[in-house]
Amino acid sequence: SETIDLQGGKAFGLLKAQQEGRLNEINKQFLDDPKYSSDEDLSRKLEAFKQKYMEFDLNGNGDIDIMSLKRMLEKLGVPKTHLELKKLIKEVSSGSGETFSYSIFLKMMLGKRSAILKMILMYEEKAREQEKPTGPPAKKAISELP
């Protein structure tokens, strides 16, 4: 009969390490590409994009599908309908299917058409900046109440 793999976490770690290796190779191609050589901070941007991509490529197959994109946008506080997501992926992948690869993701982030994903990452940065205040809440006057 079948054996049960009790090392799920270890296997997942290996999968993520392999994935990171593949993404690093793609990053190297972009760093060597003369088209992007004028972009300052390119290596820092590529590292940030790699981390984001790995976070949402949950199955580790190298592509972000519609459900991963949906999760990404919901986490960022900009949930989209299934139809909007399909349109977004179609625009990004040039109509080639319901997923997009890391290299397409990078071209989109570094190119002119990157408005949507840049906006997504910008929202996430803003969310980090607006940390919740600690301590007891400030007292309000009656006139300030809704």
From Swiss-Prot:
Transmembrane segments: none annotated. Microglial cells in the central nervous system and dendritic cells and macrophages in several organs. The gene is AIF1. Keywords: Acetylation, Actin-binding, Calcium, Cell membrane, Cell projection, Cytoplasm, Cytoskeleton, Membrane, Metal-binding, Phosphoprotein, Repeat. GO terms for molecular function: actin filament binding; calcium ion binding. One of its GO terms (cellular component) is cytosol. Ca(2+) 2 binds at T99. It is found in: Cytoplasm, Cytoskeleton; Cell projection, Ruffle membrane; Cell projection, Phagocytic cup. It comes from Sus scrofa (Pig). Residues 127-146 are annotated as: Disordered. Gene3D superfamilies: EF-hand. The modification Phosphoserine is found at S38. GO terms for biological process: actin filament bundle assembly; actin filament polymerization; cellular response to type II interferon; inflammatory response; phagocytosis, engulfment; positive regulation of G1/S transition of mitotic cell cycle; positive regulation of monocyte chemotaxis; positive regulation of smooth muscle cell chemotaxis. Its main location: cytoplasm. Pfam families: AIF-1 (PF21008). It is a peripheral membrane protein. The modification N6-acetyllysine is found at K10. This is Allograft inflammatory factor 1. It comes from the Eukaryota. Residues 44-79, 81-115 form the EF-hand domain. Ca(2+) 1 binds at D57, N59, N61, D63.
